[in-house]
C-alpha cells in the first residue's frame, strides 16, 4: 500500500491482501497453526526456534498478513498475549518477567504493529518497553518489593542484557527501535 501510494480501501489492494491469506507462505504458515491459536507447543512459545508462535507471528507480520483480515491471526495474537505477557507488560519467553529481553519484546511489539493487531493490552507492552530502556519507574534488579523491576534477562536500562554479559545489546536496541 505504501509503496504503491494506495488508499486502504483500494480494490486492487484489498484483493492482494485477501490473496495473501489464501495462498503462498502466509497460508502455509497458517495451515500449521493449532486450532487454539499457537504453533508448536502450547504456551508462551519461544521454542522451538523458528517454528513456534513467536517466530510465526513475526514472519506473518513481515509477509504482510493482517489481523483485521483474518480471524486466525487475531486468535494467535490474543493467544500469545494471554500466555507471554506479564502483569506489567513484559513479553516473556516463558510468561515470567525473568524471561524478558529487549530483542524479543521489540520483535513482538513490532510484529503486532506489522500485523495491524489492535489490543488495549499492547499499551502496557509498549509502556514497559519504553520504561525498561530509560529506567523511568523501574526498580533495580535486586529490589524484591515490586514487580515493576528489572529481572535476570532484562537487567537494567540502556539495553543491558543478562544474555550479553550484562552489557548493552545492539541486537536488542535495533529490535526496540523497530517497534518504536
Language-model features: locations:
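Preference for long, amphipathic alpha-helical scaffolds in soluble/luminal domains
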Residues: 1-180
Amino acid at each position: 500500500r505504501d509503496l504503491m501510494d494506495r488508499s486502504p480501501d483500494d480494490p486492487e489492494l484489498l484483493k492482494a491482501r485477501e490473496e495473501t491469506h489464501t495462498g503462498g507462505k502466509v497460508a502455509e504458515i497458517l495451515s500449521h497453526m493449532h486450532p487454539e491459536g499457537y504453533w508448536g507447543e502450547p504456551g508462551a512459545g519461544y521454542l522451538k526456534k523458528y517454528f513456534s508462535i513467536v517466530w510465526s507471528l513475526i514472519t506473518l507480520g513481515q509477509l504482510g498478513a493482517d489481523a483485521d483480515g483474518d480471524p486466525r491471526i487475531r486468535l494467535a495474537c490474543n493467544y500469545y498475549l494471554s500466555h507471554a505477557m506479564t502483569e506489567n507488560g513484559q513479553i516473556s519467553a516463558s510468561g515470567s518477567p525473568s524471561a524478558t529481553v529487549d530483542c524479543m519484546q521489540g520483535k513482538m511489539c513490532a510484529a503486532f504493529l506489522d500485523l495491524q493487531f489492535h489490543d488495549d493490552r499492547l499499551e502496557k507492552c509498549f509502556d514497559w518497553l519504553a520504561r525498561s530502556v530509560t529506567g523511568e519507574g523501574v526498580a533495580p534488579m535486586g529490589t524484591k518489593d515490586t514487580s515493576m523491576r528489572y529481572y535476570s534477562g532484562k537487567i537494567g536500562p540502556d539495553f543491558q542484557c543478562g544474555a550479553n554479559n550484562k552489557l548493552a545489546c545492539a541486537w536488542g536496541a535495533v529490535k526496540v527501535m523497530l517497534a518504536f
